Amino acid sequence: MDSLFLLQFACFIFMLINAIFVALSHLYVRWVNKRYERSRWMVVFAMIGLAIQYVVQMAFGFRAADDILGAVVNILIYTPCFSLIGMAIYNIETTRANRRKMNLVCGAINAATFLVFLVGISLHHSLYIKEGLYIMLVLFCMSVSYSIFMIVREMIRRKKMLETMAATDMLPYLRYSRASVFILCFSFLTMPVVIFSTTLLFIIGPLVLLALLFFNLTFIALGSTYIPTEELLDKEEENNDLVRTGYRYGGGIFCQAA
């Protein structure tokens, strides 16, 4: 049993445990918020998707056979998984109809990635899709960078709203916000390089796992600090948005009780 297989197996167990923890934390929240719960299950499905990716790599040996084959499988699964994480973060941050725009853009990028993969296979009759791999990588970077831009913009707006309207402890929210941006930025900077080199994967891979763990812990902590009275702040914000956009949507806010 080689070191690559052991690393992939460890990553599989890690993702599976994280998915279970995030899912089971639903049982320990004091108050249920629908918007947060939607984000919770997006994160759970993203963790399961990443776990499946490692099962595929172990079962078929793509990474063990060649770095290029491993990279193709990585991007094909990483793109929708990180899109789910990005949409989960954005779903909590915004109370506006921009959620629909975010979902459409991320969905379009994922569809384009899958289409490039299929076209590459049909042209080259193998997983060595050559230029298709780099197009998929560009689409992955576009997805992550777009998510970062949209999330940071909403975080700034939301932080200002909390500072002016809520007399509560913002530390859980700030920790979650920083962890969210960090995991996406770290992925954007490291994934394009790491997936092409198994050697770098042994170095950077554990750091990515730690970043994901920190994000999941802050995500769970954010849900445990939700109080229903704070939802009135988002309702007021929604009413203002309804006047400007004409869309209808629901929401909640996540703060620690005073």
Question: Residues of each region from the PLM?
Answer:
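Alpha-helical transmembrane segments and their immediate juxtamembrane interface regions
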Residues: 90-99, 208-234
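Membrane-proximal linker segments that couple transmembrane helices to downstream signaling/catalytic modules
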Residues: 218-258
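Hydrophobic alpha-helical transmembrane segments and immediately flanking/interface helices
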Residues: 77-84, 197-222
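Hydrophobic alpha-helical transmembrane segments of multi-pass membrane proteins
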Residues: 10-29, 38-63, 75-83, 109-120, ...
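The cytoplasmic-loop to transmembrane-helix boundary for the fourth helix
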Residues: 90-120, 131-140, 166-183
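Membrane-interface helix-boundary motifs at transmembrane edges
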Residues: 27-42, 65-67, 90-103, 126-129, ...
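Membrane-water interface of transmembrane alpha-helices
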Residues: 19-25, 81, 145-159
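Extracellular-loop-to-transmembrane junctions of the mid-late helices
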Residues: 2-15, 115-153, 191-205
